[in-house]
């Protein structure tokens, strides 16, 4: 093989075609399951089990969606999930903004150690925290309440949100908030009037991450709540299956209904989320 051929091969392997292929694989891997769930929600039980398996429904029906709302209190599940996720996100953002600002601006003696601990805590498997969290919630008398989910969800989302916001705050020039403080603004005032508005993409990114994390969580919602009126969507969806029956079209319809709010949220704020994920890594 000539030197020119070797150079061309290296360019192809390390250039745009390889990156495009990797991106395509990731997109297909993420979209195919969602597409299958969407199409299944319009199929009948008989059509789903027929051979050979077909992707597109022969006679699309909305009956599964009507049944999803009639078989279980799906609206109640959606409301509970939305309120828990919203309140958890607000609390997470407030705490993570303060923590990230301290890490980004204050000359903390053990800053590197704190950052390392934040990263380490974020890697803990949720199942290892289940018993301690359950005992804590029981001791506080918070079981079967929204608070029993809001507090753990906040704690679980804080590490990632703090890291995202710390990186973003570090990219904002100090001169802007210093000028505000010279004009009589307090440090808290400079944070919420200057830094947070400039860091809006990062704040939106952290908020989306916290909201989705709370919206999708199943284990804690199942373990900390036995009140049917307070069940969240992930726990409610598993109630559609019977002891010997798995109505996959109805379950798929309920899943689609649960995906729609998050999908709308991401579509609306996608530009801010993308800029928040990328701009935080730029200094100056």
Model-derived regions, located:
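A structural signal for multi-pass alpha-helical bundles of membrane permease subunits
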Residues: 15-284
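Short, Lys/Arg-rich, polar N-terminal cytosolic tail immediately upstream
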Residues: 1-13
């Amino acid at each position: 093989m000539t030197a020119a051929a070797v150079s061309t091969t290296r360019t192809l392997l390390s250039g745009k075609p390889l990156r495009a292929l990797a991106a395509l694989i990731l997109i297909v891997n993420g979209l195919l399951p969602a597409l299958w769930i969407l199409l299944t929600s319009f199929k009948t039980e008989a059509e789903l089990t027929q051979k050979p398996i077909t992707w597109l429904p022969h006679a699309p029906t909305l009956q599964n969606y009507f049944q999803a709302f009639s078989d279980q209190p799906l609206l109640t599940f959606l409301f509970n999930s939305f309120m828990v996720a919203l309140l958890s996100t607000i609390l997470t953002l407030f705490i993570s903004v303060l923590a990230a600002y301290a890490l980004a601006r204050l000359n903390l003696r053990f800053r590197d150690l704190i950052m390392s601990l934040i990263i380490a805590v974020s890697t803990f498997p949720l199942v290892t925290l289940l018993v301690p969290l359950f005992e804590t919630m029981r001791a506080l008398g918070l079981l079967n309440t929204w608070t029993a989910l809001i507090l753990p969800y906040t704690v679980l989302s804080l590490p990632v949100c703090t890291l995202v916001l710390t990186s973003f705050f570090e990219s904002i020039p100090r001169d802007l908030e210093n000028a505000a403080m010279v004009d009589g603004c307090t440090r808290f005032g400079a944070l919420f009037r200057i830094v947070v508005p400039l860091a809006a993409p990062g704040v939106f990114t952290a908020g989306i991450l916290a909201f989705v994390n709370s919206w999708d969580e199943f284990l804690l919602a199942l373990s900390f709540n036995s009140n049917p009126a307070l069940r969240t969507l992930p726990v409610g969806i598993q109630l559609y299956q019977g002891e010997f029956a798995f109505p996959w079209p109805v379950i798929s319809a309920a899943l689609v209904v649960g995906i729609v709010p998050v999908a709308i949220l991401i579509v609306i704020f996608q530009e801010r989320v993308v800029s928040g994920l990328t701009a935080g890594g730029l200094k100056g």
